[in-house]
Amino acid sequence: WPASPSSGGCLDEPNDPNRGDVHYWKVWHGNRPFTEYRKYFFRYLSEFGFQAFPSVKTIEQFTDNEEDMNPFSYIMEKHQRQYSANGKIMGYMQQTYKYPNSFPTFVYASQLLQADGIRYGVEHFRRNRGRCMGAVYWQLNDCWPVISWSSVDYCGRLKALHYYAKRFFAPLMISCEEQGMMSSEANMNREHFVFEKSIRLNVANETMQDQNVTVRWALRDP
């Protein structure tokens, strides 16, 4: 294979979603929401990702005091090699979770955010197996203690994404695809928009054997 991404020949549209492998970064670098993944049906997604903070125990190894335990402290920014990325994490976080009330909680929430984002993409691509035959997230590990796209930090501590990956890459996996449309609410004293949603459960079975399973599904308050 000549390169990555590549459509299989020279420089002929190397990021062509219909041929070869693709790198996709509109989610994260392009600030697009996780739902953006569902607009695409790549043949093979060989690079995509989302950042998260390393374990608090790892952070404690490169910080000196409590003042450093802040996403925008001098030392924390020095351990973030993408400009303004800590703010980007916070921007995505406020769209997804209630804002954490402590730095350790913030660190953990950043890892859950990363895990949910990658899970959202992988589940979509696995639901479309046949069209999409692979998804490889960037990246596995780090070469120094840093806030990054990795699922294993520099000290070998697993982020939430690494635990999630064991589930969403399992040979037998169930996923839920919510479906719906936005409709206008005529009553001005109420919300202007409401979402009418339904759900579709999908089971991906790559064991090459028939499986008997029991599915339990429920709604709960966030």
What are these regions (language model features)?
Residues 5, 9-211:
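Substrate-binding clefts and catalytic carboxylate motifs of secreted carbohydrate-active enzymes
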Residues 213-222:
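Intrinsically disordered, low-complexity Pro/Gly/Ser/Thr-rich segments with frequent PxxP/GP/PP motifs
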Residues 1:
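Conserved anion/nucleotide-ligand pocket segment
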